[in-house]
């Protein structure tokens, strides 16, 4: 009898993966609804609300308000007290998080299908905060501590400098984490004005993974998101890449970043090409496991140069611009030598073809599809596209775009990015740091 029971369970546990499909609809109130269905085992739903606001939209006076909104995400609103919001999420067995970036704010939940309407209500309620004084005060105090920790992280600090230098302190160059001195000046009125300017249906994208599109629309139409009667709006200046250099003396190993303007998220063809170029360069970490970039150019570079502790290519995309480059940690007064080696690898990578190109494309596709196995990662993947473009690709469709990348595409994007002034940031021993002009002279493609 036990044997028959076990056999019966095995015969009913086979899962046939279905094709993943993205659908998008804009409701009458301006709210954009995007869904990804198919291809996931287990009964779970991920819901996310993207708000088109980030540190790039802040000013000198409003710096830090985006962080405050993130901190207030699960606090009191017009329907529930903060403790009720948090308990509601916990009791339902759901998980939630909020994250602020340079050009968007994401509030997300993962729950069971039978709780989806309840959690969707919670998402909608978040966009109608009551902002009691003590909550604004407490959240601001927490953010001050987060800012202190962020500023003490060497890699976070250097990427702040990269953005600030590349965009000359405007738009994407504004600090992701506001200066601590500014956070102490934030008032409830300032937060209220920011809420009224950002929490509007036309400024939001609702993303669902694991819930049918029609069901998501039906449930979204039952609730109210934000204030669609607000006439206020935030500034939305177009990002202008400028480039330049920033040198800061510090003891210990030196950190070097050589960056260029990348591509905007909306340019899918170039996003695919830059993603492959990133895989060609890869990373140079002594602990890199087989199959995780040990054939990349930067791995070989780091392995063959004892002064380079580690190195890694990065590719950051935003709504209207991006940053592509290499970050490295080096020992001694070898910054100049390291930058020359990096420029040589970039020039060589621009000429990649044949087996090396195919291997880089395979690595890139594997990374994209592996990340998509997580509902939350898939939500972020399609949500970020939905903010900036009407055409949203599934992970598999983006993998197809990667397959189409040719050696000419790699050469084209590499030539395009190196045609503008690079951004060079050095923190450490700056005694032999090269000039921007000398770096440019080495980038002849």
UniProtKB/Swiss-Prot annotation:
InterPro entries: Metalloenz_LuxS/M16, MPP/UQCRC_Complex, Pept_M16_N, Peptidase_M16_C. It is found in: Mitochondrion matrix. GO terms for cellular component: mitochondrial matrix; mitochondrion; phagocytic vesicle. One of its GO terms (molecular function) is metal ion binding. One of its GO terms (biological process) is protein processing involved in protein targeting to mitochondrion. SUPFAM superfamilies: LuxS/MPP-like metallohydrolase (SSF63411). Keywords: Mitochondrion, Transit peptide. It comes from the Eukaryota. Residues 1-13 form a transit peptide. Gene3D superfamilies: Metalloenzyme, LuxS/M16 peptidase-like. Coiled coil: none annotated. It holds the Pfam family Peptidase_M16_C. Heterodimer of alpha and beta subunits, forming the mitochondrial processing protease (MPP) in which subunit alpha is involved in substrate recognition and binding and subunit beta is the catalytic subunit. Belongs to the peptidase M16 family. Substrate recognition and binding subunit of the essential mitochondrial processing protease (MPP), which cleaves the mitochondrial sequence off newly imported precursors proteins. This is Mitochondrial-processing peptidase subunit alpha-2. The gene is mppA2.
